[in-house]
């Protein structure tokens, strides 16, 4: 059975580490041989993924004691890598009601590991049991946790990003537009550090919570059946961008009818207007929820474009 230590780390069973090793091998193959050529000879040294509770003594506002009531990050460390590393928090989508934990969580984490980037897959609380500000608070706590423990995890505290897909993309854009520097006098040292991500990556994101482009399911699960229009507008990320919003990479498809491309475009234009470095790629075809797009010859190019952006942004060694 898993064991939770005093820091909220849940120790996993050995067979889970074996599955992770196999998954890593698949993704190292998919991204090509250039990464492998740069690595030292010998087998990769993989650390077993560990799940860390964001609040080991119980999350604020928790309504139960099941896993769904316990926001957490699962830590994926790249092999044969010494710090300080770039890190990214991964928020799977699922309309703020479920989490696509493999397609939009574990798979991207393994991909980032092939680039030498540490990845932290976020398990955040969901509707209809939980509503705003719980989800945003979980995301902010994840950023603070990684930053506060950066030295322990050999991470560069100023290179911590946030990637989200679909509703997770809305969470990523919300974390990018609603953050603070931390409370220097807080009792909890994690609360003393900034919740601002240093960069953001959005995959076919929900952005707007106002008509006509919102995804109604995500909006309802996040805000409830009859939300205050002012609150919905304040959480429509295209209305909240400032010059302090972090540099952002956006991936979208024109054929997406679940979250129309107008979501991504409106956010990109807001970033451009605010002078925030941003790059967006809209593919002609492709369904919503394609993850890394590895089953589609065209869509599978977007992780490569992301890699180029990360390198140009100084986020890869």
Task: Report each predicted region and the residues it spans.
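Short beta-strand element of the alpha/beta-hydrolase
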Residues: 84-93
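Primarily recognizes the serine-hydrolase "nucleophile elbow" in alpha/beta-hydrolase
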Residues: 141-218, 232-233, 237
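C-terminal catalytic histidine-bearing segment of alpha/beta-hydrolase fold enzymes
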Residues: 76, 251, 261, 265-317
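N-terminal cap/lid segment of alpha/beta-hydrolase-fold proteins
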Residues: 39-83
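Active-site glycine-rich loops that stabilize anionic/oxyanionic intermediates
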Residues: 92-97, 254
């Amino acid at each position: 059975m898993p064991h939770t230590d005093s820091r909220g780390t849940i120790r996993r069973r050995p067979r889970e580490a074996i599955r992770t090793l196999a998954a890593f091998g698949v993704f190292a193959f998919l991204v090509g041989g250039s990464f492998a050529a740069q690595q030292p000879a010998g087998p990769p040294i993989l650390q077993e993924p560990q799940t860390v509770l964001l609040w080991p003594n119980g999350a604020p506002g928790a309504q139960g004691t099941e896993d769904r009531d316990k926001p957490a990050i699962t830590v994926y460390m790249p092999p044969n890598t010494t710090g300080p590393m770039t890190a990214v928090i991964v928020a799977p989508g699922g309309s703020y009601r479920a989490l696509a934990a493999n397609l939009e969580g574990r798979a991207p984490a393994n991909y980032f590991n092939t680039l030498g980037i540490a990845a932290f897959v976020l398990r955040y609380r969901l509707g209809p049991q939980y509503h705003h500000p719980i989800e945003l608070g979980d995301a902010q706590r994840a950023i603070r946790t990684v930053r506060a423990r950066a030295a322990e995890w050999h991470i560069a505290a100023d290179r911590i990003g946030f990637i989200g897909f679909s509703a997770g993309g809305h969470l990523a854009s919300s974390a990018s537009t609603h953050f603070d520097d931390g409370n220097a006098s807080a009792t909890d040292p994690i609360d003393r550090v900034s919740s601002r991500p240093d960069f953001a990556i959005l995959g076919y994101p929900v952005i707007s919570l106002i008509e006509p482009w919102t995804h109604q399911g995500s909006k309802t699960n996040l805000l409830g059946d009859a939300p205050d229009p002012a609150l919905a507008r304040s959480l429509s990320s295209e209305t909240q961008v400032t010059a302090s919003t972090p540099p952002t990479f956006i991936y979208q498809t024109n054929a997406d009818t679940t979250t129309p491309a107008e979501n991504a475009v409106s956010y990109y234009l807001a970033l451009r207007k605010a002078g925030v470095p941003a790059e967006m790629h809209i593919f002609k075809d492709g369904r919503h929820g394609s993850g890394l797009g590895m089953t589609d010859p065209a869509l599978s190019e977007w992780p490569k474009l992301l890699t180029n952006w990360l390198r140009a942004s100084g986020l890869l060694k």
